Amino acid sequence: MLRVPDVKASLVEGAARLSTGERVFHVLTSPAVAAMVGVSNPEVPMPLLFEKFGTPDSSTLPLYAARHPELSLLRIMLSPHPYALRSHLCVGEETASLGVYLHSKPVVRGHEFEDTQILPECRLAITSDQSYTNFKIIDLPAGCRRVPIHAANKRVVIDEAANRIKVFDPESPLPRHPITPRAGQTRSILKHNIAQVCERDIVSLNTDNEAASMFYMIGLRRPRLGESPVCDFNTVTIMERANNSITFLPKLKLNRLQHLFLKHVLLRSMGLENIVSCFSSLYGAELAPAKTHEREFFGALLERLKRRVEDAVFCLNTIEDFPFREPIRQPPDCSKVLIEAMEKYFMMCSPKDRQSAAWLGAGVVELICDGNPLSEVLGFLAKYMPIQKECTGNLLKIYALLTV
């Protein structure tokens, strides 16, 4: 926690308002969140999220609401616990005695787990512009415990809990002095830590070779709970079932985990939130170098997946903006899972007729996933509605389609 040394500071819409009129707030780096709030820059001021969802609280933002399905998408992008519905995004705290405190990085708070920092990179910034368009990043030194600001009214707080008491016993023996090296004896200037900190060894997927090796390893076996980190195992397992509804490559003999991995490698290549690091912790220790033809095939799969997702979003934009004069009264002859996925997708968008858009969208997405050329699908749509050639928010829609 970082203390705001201003006696007249207050929390307003996710930011600390100072006595000088300036505001201190968090700026998170996420292209998907930027697309959600309508910002062209990937750096998103946190108060814009509070303003978009109109929360009455000035320090916390609920991550679930029945009337705001976009909050669920925001929870998936930010929270390390994406399936904890009763959770809140917390930027800081304000008390009458201690004043205003800001988290160094916003945390997700819930009854089922301890406070956990959000996933995207985040920094503190300050501005006097209430629209948050022009701001300056605050550089925090290592170990800093307060926000370095120039306020007219500062608050001094004495932390009594930091006091230490040491009692000396006159009967106790004198402490032994450490053995000092002899004069002239050389000593190493290297510093060695006595305590060995055990950290999880995560293999980062920085090359196509590693990603291709991971893809084929996932095809050979499923992760085992006793041999895997529990948090990453649960994340991958739950997302395989709940956020993997659309199979964009149905004619290939791939398991569901391989489909999920391909989607998140594509998300990573686009700079969007993904769980590739979770796959890395589950399979990274067993990677073997991929062969040349395996890397080429894996790259071709990614290109095919990207093309089909972009084609699907292009067609769904046309369906979204079309005012159906007569509603579609019969669902398409496709899987129920795909229809439900389209219903969830159009809950995040705002079509003119949600049910008709979901039913028609399911049929169109199935045609694209089966490998039909985009020209043929557009020729079919053009018989019933004008083709929408330009639309905004495509990055967010691609993320929604890959994680629905």
Curated annotation (Swiss-Prot):
Q: Name one Pfam family in it.
A: Herpes_BTRF1
This protein's record includes keyword Cytoplasm: no
Q: Where in the cell is it found?
A: Host nucleus; Host cytoplasm
Gene Ontology cellular-component terms for this entry are: host cell cytoplasm; host cell nucleus
InterPro entries associated with the record? Herpes_BTRF1
The UniProt keyword set, sorted, is: Host cytoplasm, Host nucleus
UniProt lists the family membership as follows:
Belongs to the lymphocryptovirus BTRF1 family.
Question: What's this chain's function?
Answer: Plays a role in the expression of late genes.
Q: How does it assemble?
A: Interacts with ORF34.
UniProt-recorded name of the protein: Protein ORF23
- Give the species: Human herpesvirus 8 type P (isolate GK18) (HHV-8)
Give the taxonomic lineage as stored in the record. Viruses, Duplodnaviria, Heunggongvirae, Peploviricota, Herviviricetes
